[in-house]
Amino acid sequence: MTSIQVNGPGDRAAARHGDPRRLRSTAFGLMMFLLVQFALGMVVNLYVRVPAGRAGYGPGWPVLVLHGLVGLALIAGSVSLAVRAVASRARQAAVPAVTAAVALLVAAAGGLRFLGTGVEGASLVMALCAAIAIGCYGLILYRLPGAGPQPGR
């Protein structure tokens, strides 16, 4: 475990509610993981036949399973980041983190709909929601200060 150096009353509040600068690394990791997920989704879209009746997924089913597992991990990570951002009371991180978590939940629902029906619009929902989440994590990286030395310290 790591500790936060507490020098004054403002630092005590940051330590109690979580330092928002620590959210940057999680947002960066989720954004990179989302790019991998996006690439897996493209492979599934191009090379895996998803039948409407679930008769069989062909030889590309391992990529489809990996895509689903990565999606579940992303949802867990995004919800964790959203909870931590809200708890840290850093509005500049909380709003995009919650938005990204909701977008990934909608993407998962689109994925389940696509598996059940084969409707192309559900695949589009997944891609657009992934893009929204990537943008939200980029916004967190832009808005939050880095972990390096801060001005005035």
Name the predicted role of every residue range.
Residues 2-153:
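Polytopic transmembrane helical bundles with strong interfacial aromatic enrichment
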